[in-house]
Amino acid sequence: MVLQKYVNLRHLNTKQSNINDKLLLMNIIVRRTLLSASILSLMPIMANAQTDKDSVNYDLKLDTVHVTARRPIIKTEGSKDIVHVKGSYLGKLGNLGNMLVATPGISTVGPNMYEVVGKGAPKYYVDGREVTSQDIFKTIKSSNIDRIEIEREPGGKYPAGTNAVINIITIRPLTDRISLDLYNTATFKRKVSENPSFEFKANKGVWTSSLTYDYATFGNLNKETYFTEIAHPDYTFRSDESNNNYMRSFSHTVTFANDINFSPNHRLSLVYNYAHEKEHTNDTETLTYKDRTKTTLMDVIKKEDNLSNQNTFSMSYTGKTGKNSYLFLSADYSIIDNDTKYTSDETNRQTLYNNYSLTNNDGKYNLATVNLAYNFALPYKIGAETGGRYYNTHHSLHYATSYKMATNDQQSNHQVLDDNVSAAYLTLQRSWKNVWASIGGRYEYSDTKINIDTKSNSYKAARHTSDFLPSASVIWTPKQGLRFQAHYNRSIQRQGYMGLVPFSVYKDSLSYTSGNTQLLPGYTDTYSFYTTWKSLTLGFIYSHTTNEISNVTYNPDQNTDIVCEMPLNMNNSDSYQIFASYRKSFGKLFFSGTASMQIPRFSYEYLGKKCKASKVSCSGNANLSYFISSHFTAFTNFSFQSYNERLNRIQKAANNWMAGLQANLLDDCLSISLTFTDILHKANYNNLDYRYMNTREGTYGSNDMRGISLSLSYSLFNQNLKVKGSRNDQEVINRTM
């Protein structure tokens, strides 16, 4: 570690002419720990030199401090992976979305779509505050992130159905400062995207404030084909929609955040976020379908325009209420206005028959979330954490369509949807010499209501669920570097609104969606076992699911070629998974690898037979970073998955290889990162095949993920700790650690 300190020296009285030259050529080398260096960097240094007759007094005062260090980017603590962002190349990649693309253990499967290897899509938190509807991937800057914590085994503290958790811990300024930073990310794929933004930050005493503005234009072009096969008694109907799906969006986002640190143990955060987005999607399709006697060609143009305005108010409080007690409280309230216009224009090439429909969907969401956590100590060295969560969604929706096949009640209706989930949890934990154990449970009560008014009818329905979801963990550390752990967790999959809606919504002339009022909740019990020896972790995970809810597509009427998509309770399923991860530093090179092998056990009905999903599949992630110098870092991230089966879904193999170079220039004022994504052009996670009853449907084609991304961030000004010197002469003292 090298600390360069610009020093002002002042001579008060001397007769020795050579002392000046000696002081200006002074080069001090001191070995210290990182903690010592941090403390010294905050203190003015006074040095006194004396001669026999006269004395020389000079002040050494710090103007700027440059710290260069290397440490492992990621480490494992129990079931949690901690990724150090501050001080690494990850903190210089622009925004959170750019950072997650290069983060070890994370797979990118689509635009702002990320998965934890072996666990699936995570739930996001920022400083412990649950993220609900905000777009954090472009608004949170990577330079403001201290670390991210990836929890692979979320317990009763988190909402039911949480596969994994990513908690983003931001940096808290320690000194009075003011800064203005500019950012821009330009991405060149089939279509060009750009995200310029600026962030103004100020810290004075106990108050910290920031104002961020983001403008984003995003373009995406997927080239894929949707297919459907219906097995009739005497023939097979097949349709293929060759589709160019072009989506373009424009958004403006303003975030105003304030932190008040009343004391080192009490912090209040207030955040306001406004987001405006216009999105246009254009599908140009050639539809080919074959029935018993003929082949029909149709030209289809589908357009969707969406206008969204969102206002979000967030609050969180963290405080120490006693010697061994802590309180965390967060609240989040969003108002979302969403207006969607959808058109479908179908023209038969042979007969020139045209079928045009217009659908309007105007809705307003009110979304409120409150989370509470309280840690305290009990007798017999037992630690306890209790808390709760309240989640409320109120959705008012007006739906109208001109589709010819829709019935009178289906053509227009007004819907009011309410979903309330109240939860409370309690966790008890105890530590012995080398054993840590935790046991707890989460109780959740849900109340879902729907009220639909059509032209001629009114419909009301409600459903309540009440569930207790236990969890337990044991960690045994027989010696340093060796750790064994076991976890158990139960989660629930609720029916939601589709479990109450009786009406159908037509997508086009050959398909529609429908609700299912007969749905039951699904439950999953997961047992996990891990062994860690230094940098190597091995794991085994078993899960059993009852009544899992999945969307299926089938043909309910053999006299037509129209398919229906609806949610159903599937048969019981089992999953066996073997997990391995390894992290190691080799000088300037850091490697992180994660791999998972999964064996499913599931059966479903297709073409009158019972089909079994039992093929072994693999997925993984390999990450390399090389510290070239204090100014340049090279990195690469490779994610892969093999052919895999999940319930009645089959997904083809896919991979995503990215590589990049990150540079810090102009005394760290300018950061540049150049990233190449989907280098092999194999990140086609949209190659899917669904089978159920008499119908097979899915997609094949290519995603728009291959391209080049250039991210820039520039600090216009940043006033940190500054101590004025007392002499005009300046010198650099190098401290090497």
What is each PLM-predicted segment?
Residues 367-370, 520, 526, 537-595, ...:
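Outer membrane beta-barrel strand-and-loop segments of large Gram-negative receptors
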Residues 207, 253-278, 301-453, 477-483, ...:
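Face-selective signature of the C-terminal outer-membrane beta-barrel domain
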Residues 413-419, 463, 492-546, 563-576, ...:
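Outer-membrane beta-barrel signature, preferentially recognizing the C-terminal barrel domain
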